[in-house]
Regions:
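RNA-binding basic/glycine-rich loop and surface signature characteristic of RAMP-family CRISPR effectors
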Residues: 1-166, 170, 174-303
Length: 303
């Protein structure tokens, strides 16, 4: 973080498991070529092996937008709800998200602390003559979300993975039909998900403190799991209002690994993991993971 402070690495928390489709899912891809009788709206596929996958950007974006609905931040000592204050769209198609204006706000924001924020220099300098020319700075995300790849059990050449669903829009005035074809993944298809949360002691200025960020860690892990539960009731991908994209998350691992683990000083068996458990069961492991990671960061690595 340079002149804005210091980030001291303490460990990682791993979220691993399966995303199981309960209904057909559509995450749109691009049409590389026009074909007579081709699908109007194909799904996204890996260009190397032509297998479908769930992009990390799609899952992370859904997690972030979900947390923006109930997350909060501390500003000037007061708790406040979040506003959609940053446009990430185009001039013609505006898309607004929440994004804190500077590092100080991002550190105290439940959304930006997990998913990151790009500083807004104009807002940061507004009304501060002595800060003219200062940069707000970026706050890198603590959570990394990988692409969810197809489960090996579904990779048999004869296995049918998708269907083409024909949908019809009807003009309310003329009653003319407008059919379209949508490709979607079949129910019960499974993908392997992995997310990694970086546990860091973040100090904005001066020497890094040795205080373990227990409160923020518990809040962040709980918020991530809460978002996953909400996604189970809402869905992932397009057309969720028409029944697409209902999913279930099944954990195979929810574990914490300290810096000592990466240095080879602790046994692998000390990680907190299990197989085939629900989000609620994962939530019960939060305190156990925090205790595993909670130690004096004497040998921590800072940037």
């Amino acid at each position: 973080m340079g002149q804005n402070g210091q980030r001291v690495f303490l460990g990682k928390v791993f979220f691993r498991g399966k995303i199981i489709l309960k209904t057909g899912m559509h995450i749109g891809g691009s049409q590389e070529s026009m074909q007579i009788g081709g699908v109007d709206s194909p799904i996204i596929r890996d260009s190397g092996n032509n297998l479908p996958y769930i992009p990390g950007s799609s899952l992370k974006g859904k997690l972030r937008s979900t947390l923006e609905k109930f997350g909060k931040r501390i500003k000037e000592g007061k708790e406040e709800k979040l506003s959609s204050n940053r446009s990430i769209g185009t001039f013609r198609q505006k898309v607004f998200i929440h994004c804190c204006e500077d590092i100080q706000l991002a550190l105290n924001c439940e959304v930006c602390r997990i998913f990151g924020a790009t500083g807004d220099d104009r807002e940061f300098q507004k009304g501060k003559k002595d800060r003219r020319g200062d940069k707000a700075g970026n706050f890198p995300a603590l959570l990394m979300v990988r692409d969810s790849l197809l489960d090996d059990a579904f990779m048999h050449p004869s296995r049918l993975l998708t269907e083409v669903k024909t949908e019809t829009g009807v003009d309310r005035s003329t009653m003319a039909a407008n059919p379209r074809q949508v490709e979607r993944l079949l129910p019960d298809t499974a993908f392997i998900f992995e997310m990694v949360y970086s546990v860091e002691n973040i100090t904005l200025a001066g020497k890094a403190k040795t205080n373990f960020p227990e409160a923020n860690l518990k809040t962040d892990l709980d918020n991530i799991l809460t978002c996953m539960e909400i996604i189970e009731s809402e869905g992932i991908g397009g057309h969720t209002s028409r029944g697409y994209g209902k999913v279930s998350f099944v954990f195979t691992e929810f574990s914490g690994r300290s810096l000592d683990y990466f240095k080879g000083k602790t046994e692998k068996e000390k990680e907190k993991s299990d197989g085939g458990f629900s989000i609620q069961e994962a939530r019960e492991k939060i305190d156990e993971i925090v205790k595993l990671l909670q130690k004096e960061p004497e040998n921590a690595v800072s940037d």
